[in-house]
From Swiss-Prot:
Organism of this sequence: Mycobacterium gordonae
Protein name: Diacylglycerol acyltransferase/mycolyltransferase Ag85A
Family: Belongs to the mycobacterial A85 antigen family.
EC assignment: 2.3.1.122, 2.3.1.20
Localization (cell): Secreted, Cell wall; Cytoplasm
PANTHER family registered for this protein in UniProt: DIACYLGLYCEROL ACYLTRANSFERASE_MYCOLYLTRANSFERASE AG85A, ENTEROCHELIN ESTERASE-RELATED
Subunit structure: Homodimer.
InterPro entries linked to this entry: AB_hydrolase_fold (IPR029058), Esterase-like (IPR000801), Mycobacterial_A85_antigen (IPR050583)
Length: 339
């Protein structure tokens, strides 16, 4: 079974039946799943940062969508930081778990953090998204590529083109798909610890299990049964578009071994070892298609946890500024941090 073969590098010496059972245990764990770790109830960003809380109308989704926003100055490009499977309705996980606003303050890049979208893959769903909390409309791709950039251009002087999408876990594949199909808006895409071949092997079944645990959603409501929509949203099958677009890519994945950054728990170690295989396959496909505009950051450590996703977002800052043509120092004044 292909699924079990993936784990031989992540978990050794484990009988076949126990390995299969461990898959379900890891995916249904309250710790991570394909989720992006656990979260606290308050934001990380310190008082004094010029972070705004916007309510952006979405006709496609029939409601206002909360956006956490930090301006990079007039006519600045944007960095869309996309959340994991367990995205909350109060704050974006990047603000809950990292000082990302601090890292990019005065960078010349506007930081855009959509709030909500649990289990959504930031996609336009075939059917209403029905879960434990009831039913809602998920048209996230339409919102991110049409409604939100138009709002930010009109109200916050953010360029509607030439921006970046970076996502962790669930949203890593989403960022690549956004760049594949919307190359003018997203010239840069970053994927951190994502499953990059979701339509392959048992991908749809495992994603369905994880979505059921993270909100009670059904994968069939998202992209239907196996078929064209799953393939359309599979980065490993859309490599040709990314190469043809000359999208700038940053692909990160650890190997399931913890370092001093933490994440030393079985689900975090197991999941990172699992998704690494799809990342290596994506790199092979990208190189085979003639790609030459990507950073592949495959560390000899790293588990499925926030400290390992914060590190590459800091590391790619200069590359983002150069690629997007940002003007460092632009943006609203910031109060100094207290000692």
């Amino acid at each position: 079974m292909k699924l079990v073969d993936r784990f031989r590098g992540a978990v050794t010496g484990m009988p076949r039946r126990l390995m299969v059972g461990a898959v379900g245990a890891a995916l249904l764990s309250g710790l991570v799943g394909f989720v992006g770790g656990s979260a606290t109830a308050s934001a990380f960003s310190r008082p004094g940062l010029p972070v705004e809380y916007l309510q952006v109308p979405s006709a496609a989704m029939g409601r206002n969508i909360k956006i956490q926003f930090q301006s990079g100055g007039a006519n600045s490009p944007a960095l869309y930081l996309l959340d994991g499977m367990r995205a909350q309705d109060d704050y974006n996980g990047w603000d809950i778990n990292t000082p990302a606003f601090e890292w990019y303050n005065q960078s010349g890049i506007s930081v855009v953090m959509p709030v909500g979208g649990q289990s959504s893959f930031y996609s336009d769903w075939y059917n209403p998204a029905c879960g434990k909390a009831g039913c809602t409309t998920y048209k996230w791709e339409t919102f991110l590529t049409s409604e939100l950039p138009a709002y930010l251009a009109s109200n916050k002087q953010v360029k509607p083109t030439g921006s970046a999408a970076v996502g962790l876990s669930m949203a890593g594949s989403s960022a690549l798909i956004l760049a594949a199909y919307h190359p003018d808006q997203f010239v840069y895409a970053g994927s951190l610890s994502a499953l990059l071949d979701p339509s392959q092997a048992m991908g749809p079944s495992l994603i369905g299990l994880a979505m059921g645990d993270a909100g009670g959603y059904k994968a069939s409501d998202m992209w239907g049964p196996r078929g064209p929509a799953w393939q359309r949203n599979d980065p490993s099958l859309q490599v040709g578009k990314l190469v043809a677009n000359n999208s700038r890519l940053w692909i990160y994945c650890g190997d399931g071994k913890p370092s001093d950054l933490g994440g030393n728990n079985l689900p975090a170690k197991f999941l990172e070892g699992f998704v690494r295989t799809s990342n290596l396959k994506f790199q092979e496909a990208y190189n085979g298609a003639g790609g030459h505009n990507a950073v592949f950051n495959f560390d000899a450590n790293g588990t499925h946890d926030w400290p390992y996703w914060g590190a590459p977002v800091q590391a790619m800052k200069g590359d983002l500024q150069s690629t997007l043509g940002a003007t460092p120092g632009a943006g609203p004044a910031t109060a100094a941090a207290s000692a």
